[in-house]
Curated annotation (Swiss-Prot):
A cellular component term, taken from the record's GO annotations: centriole
InterPro entries the UniProt entry points to: Cyclodeamin/CycHdrlase, Formiminotransferase_C, Formiminotransferase_C_sf, Formiminotransferase_cat, Formiminotransferase_N, Formiminotransferase_N_sf, FormiminoTrfase_cat_dom_sf, Formintransfe-cycloase-like_sf
Gene that this polypeptide is encoded by: Ftcd
Residue ranges of the region described as Linker: 327-334
Record region (Cyclodeaminase/cyclohydrolase): 335-541
Organism ancestry: Eukaryota, Metazoa, Chordata, Craniata, Vertebrata
This protein's name: Formimidoyltransferase-cyclodeaminase
Homology family: In the C-terminal section; belongs to the cyclodeaminase/cyclohydrolase family.
Protein's organism: Mus musculus (Mouse)
Pathway given in the UniProt record: Amino-acid degradation; L-histidine degradation into L-glutamate; L-glutamate from N-formimidoyl-L-glutamate (transferase route): step 1/1; One-carbon metabolism; tetrahydrofolate interconversion
Length: 541
């Protein structure tokens, strides 16, 4: 899995297109950096850039952007709706893939130190990189904004983490750090700025102060007026969308607005958003409205509609969801990106991978997909109206399992590659032999874990498949028969892939426990597949 860090620098310029473009070029021309999004706000006079790359690359990209900004932005002349204290106001580093939070903290520290040394400006650390509890949140550091800096920098409490304690009028100060994925989410209101701010105070965790906290944890908020759209916004930052979800903020803001008799007219996502945040919202609305929506594309479309994400500008998921913009290509091409003909050709080639493990995963995925198909060929037809609620319950497990099992096609090939890499390690000294042995054992654990997961996933499907066999559309009888044998065959393949990798493992307790588990899963698959086939034969008669 390739390492990927996201960097989201916020520069205090949202009107001068030449400056905005110059900073964009500085980032995109940095080797290893991919500029994903540039979101300029005229009223806020601020532009949010989003780019990704490996850790060392994003640090360089942020520095290149800062150098450019230092020549083009003069904070002494800056005015805008958004709180700010510097030309490069804030520059967070966020783990996206294959990177720990600790590694992002190192990115922030390296960037902060180099920025301070090169430009001779004050730099503060916040979030996970904060050196003191009082500097963990951005609003705490930014209190008083740019205008308060001359006096603030004289206070011992606010000595910068890097750089001088002197005021630099053209620059101000910069805050950098590491954090989880922050979602900038604004709810649109036909109201005054003051009414929007009143709602923000009720919602944000900080509330109106220590004695009057707000309702939503890990949420920052402010109300402002968006002149270019002629409406107000409750502007929020979701610091952890798994603590307070996107839809929770929207629904709570709408409830507050209703109490004030104010219309909510959609919302706006600034920058990029993780796929999970939208899928969580889709799950909420599907549950709330008792909707049956399976496909990821449709679930995202539902969320765009319910939140009104396209109310101010078109919302293109391919350009706004980070996983869609930066797929995990890794060093090898995904088997899932090849055609069926190409996959079969690769299996038949003179190479050990893809092998039986990948084929078992593909067969099981097809079995789950067939069961999903039978459910959908039953659902929504007038003669099966009485089965509507049953199909709504039975189809989703097969739909989800087919995606999970499909991902194991690649996972098995990667696990095999990890074992091969371990075998190739040098073994000339005792230390090298120990390192090689540890790497090989870890590789074997991965090679066991993938087929075991396959068998466990299929195990969860048997009850639903039994029920589907009793009531599914009989026109699809042969499809269900193939589904049952495909799922059984997938577990059959998983069983032998587990066994062949277990034999070289040294942990006897793990070997015995795993052998017992995979054996029971294989026996279950044989029994359950036979029962499904028997039920189908009985219905045919």
């Amino acid at each position: 899995m390739s390492q990927l860090v996201e960097c989201v620098p916020n520069f205090s310029e949202g009107n001068n297109q030449e400056v905005i473009d110059a900073i964009s070029r500085a980032i995109s021309q940095t080797p290893g950096c991919v500029l994903l999004d540039v979101d300029a706000g005229p009223s806020t006079n601020r532009t949010v850039y989003t780019f990704v790359g490996q850790p060392e690359c994003v640090v360089e990209g942020a520095l290149h952007a800062a150098r450019t900004a230092s020549q083009l932005i003069d904070m002494s002349k800056h005015k805008g709706e958004h709180p700010r204290m510097g030309a490069l106001d804030v520059c967070p580093f966020i783990p996206v893939r294959g990177v720990s939070m600790e590694e992002c903290v190192l990115c922030a520290k390296a960037f902060g130190q180099r920025l301070a040394e090169e430009l001779n400006v004050p730099v503060y650390l916040y979030g996970e990189a904060a050196q003191t509890p009082s500097r963990q949140t951005l609003p705490a550091i930014r209190a008083g904004e740019y205008e308060a800096l001359p006096e603030k920098l004289k206070q011992a409490e606010w000595v910068p983490d890097f750089g001088p304690s002197s005021f630099v009028p053209s620059w101000g100060a910069t805050v950098t750090g590491a954090r989880k994925f922050l979602i900038a989410f604004n709810i649109n209101l036909l109201s005054t700025k003051e009414q929007a701010h009143r709602i923000a105070l009720n919602l944000r965790e900080q509330g109106r102060g220590k004695d009057q906290p707000g309702r939503l944890k890990k949420v920052q908020g402010i109300g402002w007026y968006l002149e270019e759209k002629n409406l107000a916004q409750v502007s929020t930052n979701l610091l952890d969308f798994e603590v307070t979800a996107l839809h929770t903020v929207f629904e709570e803001a709408r409830r507050e607005a209703q109490e004030l008799n104010l219309p909510v007219v959609g919302s706006q996502l600034v920058g990029l958003v993780p796929l999970k945040a939208l899928l969580d919202a889709a799950a909420f609305y599907c549950d709330k409205e008792k909707l049956f929506v399976l496909e990821e594309e449709h679930r995202i479309r539902l969320v765009v509609n319910r939140l009104g994400l396209d109310s101010l500008a078109p919302f293109d998921p391919k350009e706004r969801i980070i996983e869609y913009l930066v797929p995990d290509s890794g060093p090898e091409q995904s088997l899932l990106d090849t055609s069926l003909r190409g996959f079969v050709r690769e299996v038949g080639a003179r190479s050990a991978a893809p092998g039986g493990g990948s084929v078992a995963a593909a067969v099981a995925a097809l079995g789950a997909a067939l069961a999903s198909m039978v459910g959908q060929m039953t659902y929504g037809r007038r003669q099966f109206d009485h089965l509507d609620s049953t199909m709504r319950r039975l189809i989703p497990p097969f739909h989800a399992a087919s995606a999970q099992l499909t991902s194991l096609v690649d996972a098995d090939a990667r696990a095999f590659a990890a074992c091969l890499e371990a075998i190739k390690l040098p073994k000339n000294t005792p230390e090298e032999r120990d390192r090689r042995a540890c790497a090989l054992q870890e590789g074997l654990r991965q090679a066991v874990a993938v087929p075991l997961k396959l068998a466990e996933t299929v195990s969860q499907l048997w009850p639903a498949l039994q029920e589907l066999a009793h009531c599914g559309n009989l026109s699809c009888l042969s499809d269900l028969q193939v589904a049952a044998k495909a799922l059984e065959t997938g577990v059959f393949g998983a069983y032998f892939n587990v066994l062949i990798n277990l034999k070289d493992m040294t942990d006897d307790v793990f070997k015995e426990k795993t052998h017992h588990r995979i054996s029971s899963l294989l026996q279950e698959a044989k029994t359950q597949a036979a029962l499904v086939l028997g039920s189908l034969e009985a219905r045919k008669e």
